[in-house]
Amino acid sequence: MKKLVLASGNAGKLGELRAMLAGVALQITAQGEFGVQDVPETGLTFIENALIKARHACLMTGFPALADDSGLIVDALGGAPGLYSARYAGTPTDAAANNAKLLEMLRDVPAGRRCARFYAVIVLLRHAEDPQPLIADGCWEGEIAFEPCGSGGFGYNPIFFDPLYGMTAAQMGAELKNKISHRARALERLRDCLHTFMA
């Protein structure tokens, strides 16, 4: 069984990725189990940040690495918080503060103009100098609620409302969320490549 390092220190993200990859015959190990710390995300795009994280994990562990970068894109805010989703309200990262800041920024934006999407890109590097990384992305369309609702998930989940299901991401069960989320869609696109990778 091949070993794959998940290049993330985010426990919520790590749990989601592990759950979604449960059926794949890989030994998945978090980078923290190797003593690897998060690397600064200095890229200008989600893809660049995912590559930076995957390359760092490969260099530090000697194993193939899977990394994702994701964020919330709000049309009424010109794409913010975008790349800065985790640090929107400043550092250290604080989900409740991020949610509060976003709701404040949208205070005067009416229903129907609060369109948003979660976007994720997932990168798989076979080794640190892999010239042909496997890259997949996924998007989850929704809108920003007027107040937090639900206790599941993490990050912006309490204020990200999916009109098709009539609930926020935080109100969804993990099974549903892990089928329709931006990460789930990106992983689904990467799944065939993972089977080739394992061969």
From Swiss-Prot:
Q: How is the cofactor bound?
A: Binds 1 Mg(2+) ion per subunit.
Which stretches are transmembrane? none
Q: Which domain of life is it from?
A: Bacteria
Annotated GO biological processes are:
nucleotide metabolic process; purine nucleoside triphosphate catabolic process
E.C. number:
3.6.1.66
GO MF terms held by the record: dITP diphosphatase activity; ITP diphosphatase activity; metal ion binding; nucleotide binding; ribonucleoside triphosphate phosphatase activity; XTP diphosphatase activity
Which top EC class applies here?
Answer: hydrolase
Chain residues that bind Mg(2+): 69
Q: Which cofactor does it need?
A: Mg(2+)
Q: How does it assemble?
A: Homodimer.
Q: Could you tell me what this protein is called?
A: dITP/XTP pyrophosphatase
